[in-house]
Amino acid sequence: MDNNERRDKGMVYISDEAVFEKQKRARRLTYKMNNMDTSDFEGIAEVARELFGKCGKNIMVNPPFHCDYGKNIEVGDNFFCNYNCVILDCNKVTIGDNCLFAPNVSIYAAGHPIHSACRNTGYEYAREIHIGNNVWIGGNVVICPGVTIGDNAVIGAGSIVTKDISAWTVVAGNPCKVIREITDDDIEFFFKNNRFDENAFMDMERIWRENSNNGKFSFRNKGKLPEIIKRVKERFCNG
């Protein structure tokens, strides 16, 4: 069994010449992407679709972007990746629909042994990383090997994620901890205690209503949504 096979089976392996040979495709494609006219959005997206193992519709990547293999990265629809993202995809990295990455997001499926005597032999490992649907990852976040992030989670800027993150939570810190749960009451606010203005909120309600069956918009409890929307509208009426 060679080291590429060991890596793909989740075993420890050594990055020898055969392993580095497998990385050359990604290096050529990322070099191409990172040296393109940055206003050529569709051209960059076309290279990303060639680079990634699976790719949904309507994606946008702002170069520079770096990865090890590319083929181990799977992204869903409406993926937005801001500047200077690094994905060490020595194992599979799956990213769901409607995910947003701020600048300098780092996703590390790769790792090394704790003990230096083991580490210095050259053996390393890789563990899958799974990111659910509708996840927003803030700037300078680091996601470590083996982590799963649940749907609709928000990861605060500068966080170091070493453990699984539950769905519908806001998390932040080093190490990353739960700050609070996200509820449907949050639809009233866009930043801290800043509320959406009436025009913006009514436009969002229209978009939700017109797209109620396409699965893009998630709510924790749709049954309570009319009550929340009514309360927000009453606030507009009352000034």
Go through each PLM region and give its residues:
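A generic "structured core" feature
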Residues: 60, 130-132, 136, 154-156, ...
